Amino acid sequence: MIISVASSAACLYSDNKQAVLFFWPEVKFPAFMSKSMMRCLKLKKLFELRNAVLMSVLVGSYVISGGTTAFAEEMKTFNLDEMIVTATATPVDKVKTAASVYVITSKEIEDKQYQNLYEALQSVPGMNSRLYGNGVGYELSGYSVPSLRDKYAVVLIDGVNQAMDSKARNSLIDINPRDIDRIEVLKGSASVLYGSNAIGGVINVITKRADSGVQSAIKYSVGNFGYQSYNINNRGSEGNVYWSVNLERRNAGDYEDGSGVNHPTDKKNNIANVKFGYKANDKMDFIVKYDSSHQDMKWSELYKKSGVVANHDGEFNIDNITLISDFVDKKNGEGNNFYVFKGNMKAVRNYHHNPDKELDDGSYTFKDSGETYKVKAFRIADRYYKQINDEHRILIGAEHYDYKDVYLEGKNKIKENSVFLQDEWNFAKNFKLTSGVRYVVPGDFAGKYITSFNLGYNPADNLGLYIARNEYYVQPSMGQVFGTYLYNPNPDIKPTSGNTLELGVNYQIDNTSFLNANIYRREEDNSISWVKEGTKRKYVNVDGTAQNNGLELAYEKQFDENWKTKLSYFRTWSNKSGKQSFLPKDIVSINIDYSKGKTDVGLFGLGKYNLYGKSQLYYDSLPTDSFWVVNAYANYKPTKDIKIFARINNLFDKDYSNAGNWFKLKDGSIDAIDYSDEGRNFMVGVEYSF
């Protein structure tokens, strides 16, 4: 079995109009999938290399272990239903996880009526997802990328990387709460297992698998600031087929910030999430997914000094298709996950400015202008694991991606190939060492090996100590290499490399409380910033090593069957070189939840302190550099089929902003832009299930 698996190629071929996966010759894909998946033939050499490495590792491990292939009962089988996203990619007990992992459950998502990833991630320690205002019009901004420890994080859906470029910009703008089992957040570099752009960490949205029977739901909600949402959802299974279909229309209008200033905004968003699965046998699943979000939008920029209101409009569209094959053999401790992801993202932004305003360097005139940004992303990845014996488990894989901006002139494509290997070794009863290596070939740049080491020690069943060191190596984005309408190209820019060292503890205090504490240090070379060049700017590498240090505490307590709380604290300090840090020095979050019978209520408080350091509140574009925001929610189920819900955001009508910007005018003065977030706002709705 080992030799036959290792010598086979992880690719597809056409045979009598049916595609066959070489790893499992007895399993055939449905005919309609053949054409879509034939592209992986181009990557045959990459996967053959992976399999050659796999054969040597497996045979060597088999000989060393004396041919023992017993499956360790305490180590659960790797599959998407049970996987906890950690630095080891192994489903383990929370105490034994040699990493800092934060879990958001499906109940939390549904009870608190989260509408997007930004809302759901606010309570995660070290998370700093920032938006310009309410986010409309800035879906492509770096602020839209979830940030962990001041570095962007990779977003996965069922293990599938959703990145649309090397800066990890992703298309997970909206989520369907009914389809999510949990969201697991791994903090710290995880590039060896999850790709070179997993610098800050990994956010894995794990969806539910097949439910017995058929379930449907319709939901309507309405609020101030023009908010409306119409949603219909259907999911279930019949025989070997299972599915989930979600359709939603969401509208939003002008909003007022906490000081009463009106911000002209308009959003009309159509969302569709469709998933079909086929269970070929008790070991193999095939899944096809389509995710779409089409948005027409208008937004504004308010200039504080001049009083100018610049009104803009545009559209933002996402269309993604994902194909997955998931093989799990629990009896033999073996499995394989293979996926193909094809994403299309288009943004059209039309700017309408005051023609009398102009930047000091002449790089941008405040007049009517526009830009179109269209990216085609393709990613194919394969991951195979094998339980060798009670002590050893290996995981090996290969990945290819390419991103293409169809509107860039000249060379407009970046790509990356990589192979990776990981070994999990249990030794001396209470120790576990997980080590890995990935060889990355980022397009035209030199290839590089990056490594990871996670050592866990469990002196007691309720206590886990760990130390981890993980490296990363990520190539510049398309805009940094090829330029944009504001930036000149820089073909000489270099990839960024670095490492994160972390020490932590996971402590199950008793049956009702849990504590995670960790400290980390990240060092980075060839960080990327920008300088002026003529009438434009240019991205360049920063000299010296940038260092970021942090401390995180997360505490959970279930007081009784009704009351529970989550508390977290994050502190960071750094010597950022040549670049302004946008990570607050201190972030505090408090969750208090109460559930009894038909009622669920709760409060969430988020405090951020010293957002921009000593930068004069980023030239006065922020109302304050420190703030507390409190949200509240309530749900009531008069019957098992009906749920009435309400949510209030910014309960105390705080005037605050997560992002700032400014422009230097020709007369030398500074005009700051007001990106204040929404003031007190509410949402009420009803959901009917049948």
Over which residues does each language-model region extend?
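Conserved C-terminal beta-signal and adjacent last beta-strands/turns
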Residues: 40, 46-55, 59, 71, ...
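Outer-membrane beta-barrel signature, preferentially recognizing the C-terminal barrel domain
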Residues: 73, 305-330, 373, 464, ...
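Short acidic/polar hinge/loop motifs at secondary-structure boundaries
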Residues: 160-187
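Surface-exposed extracellular loop regions of Gram-negative outer-membrane beta-barrel proteins
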Residues: 296, 303-304, 409-411, 443-448, ...
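Gram-negative outer-membrane beta-barrel transporters
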Residues: 426-432, 520-523, 542-616, 643, ...
